[in-house]
């Protein structure tokens, strides 16, 4: 009862074909593949961006403290 048999999967597949039609399912899968490819390309673009260059010059700030307490 807990697992689905082959007949259950065939019925689900038949219902999906009736709802979406024969041409719509490959189109949906193509859109999913394009989305995944675009996501991977975006992730690779982020990794190729060089980190900002760090400044090698140091700064010294001089300040005299107020001695009136």
Curated annotation (Swiss-Prot):
Entry keyword annotation includes Transmembrane: yes
Protein name: Sec-independent protein translocase protein TatA
Name of the gene: tatA
Gene Ontology terms for molecular function: protein transmembrane transporter activity
Subcellular location: Cell inner membrane
PANTHER family from the UniProt entry: SEC-INDEPENDENT PROTEIN TRANSLOCASE PROTEIN TATA (PTHR42982:SF1)
Natural source organism: Rhizobium rhizogenes (strain K84 / ATCC BAA-868) (Agrobacterium radiobacter)
Keywords from the named record: Cell inner membrane, Cell membrane, Membrane, Protein transport, Translocation, Transmembrane, Transmembrane helix, Transport
GO terms under cellular component: TAT protein transport complex
Entry's family note: Belongs to the TatA/E family.
Transmembrane segments: 1-21
Function (record text): Part of the twin-arginine translocation (Tat) system that transports large folded proteins containing a characteristic twin-arginine motif in their signal peptide across membranes. TatA could form the protein-conducting channel of the Tat system.
Topology with respect to the bilayer: Single-pass membrane protein
Quaternary structure annotation from Swiss-Prot or TrEMBL: The Tat system comprises two distinct complexes: a TatABC complex, containing multiple copies of TatA, TatB and TatC subunits, and a separate TatA complex, containing only TatA subunits. Substrates initially bind to the TatABC complex, which probably triggers association of the separate TatA complex to form the active translocon.
UniProt keyword Cell membrane present: yes
Pfam families: TatA_B_E
Segments for region (Disordered): 41-69
Record-linked InterPro entries: TatA/B/E, TatA/E
Biased segments, Basic and acidic residues type: 60-69
One of the GO BP terms on file: protein transport by the Tat complex
